[in-house]
Amino acid sequence: VDTPQGVKGYVQTGLFERSVLDSLTDIFPMDGVKVTYRLAEAEDKNWNEEWERNGFEPVRIADRILIHSPEHHSLSPAEYDIVIDPHQAFGTGTHHTTGMILERLLGMDLGHKTVLDAGCGTGVLGIFCTLKGAKSVWAYDIDRWSVDNTKENMLLNGVKNMEVVEGNASILQGKDAFDLILANINRNILLADLPSFVSVMHAESQMILSGFYVEDMPLLVQKAKSLGLSYLNHTEKENWATLLFERL
């Protein structure tokens, strides 16, 4: 769970090994970043039941998008209403990276566009694209929970022109080109997957990347340019960033 102070996580006491956590923080794959942590014993309660009952707070993006759980009722309407039951997947609009991509998409003409949602999480980005007129969305995630959750959220929103599969960027081999690619993952995976993304872009295809810090942008821009992409612009919010590219 993202908080203003960092990331909060939970693990069963019997499965926790401090030595493993220490070794992982020592090799954290971001230059110049030192990870610290503190431990506390959590209250003994049924956390799944708590999450199912309370969900997340409704999120409004640019006063035009409303993202909420099925449990939220009597909310003031919005131009785009998205129902998300996130379970264990990422993507409710509460994180700056998701919000910034949605803000970008609001200003884009998605009519009749084909969209790739890479690392889809809850599927919120792809679902929004269908609501905004995209011809079709093809999504994937390496996590089976996310794939199943995206399918559930597609049903909740009445989405029929979107497909989601389990896998990583290697499953893009042989796919037709997309008009728009969305990838909200992290710096290292993006750097590794950029060649696969470019392989399914045609001239004038665009790509929005996020899931990384402002200081990571030069590496990503350099890699993208080496693959024949043109940097268009970027956005920032509280040290998180998005990048927009176009294939030449």
Where are the regions that the model predicts?
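N-terminal auxiliary segments of SAM/dcSAM-dependent transferases
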Residues: 1-76
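Conserved beta-strand segments of alpha/beta enzyme cores
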Residues: 36-38, 66, 136, 161-163, ...
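Residues that mark the start of a beta-strand
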Residues: 66, 81, 113-114
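A short, charged helix-loop
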Residues: 80-86
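Conserved SAM/SAH cofactor-binding pocket of Class I
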Residues: 88, 92-170
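S-adenosylmethionine
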Residues: 142-248
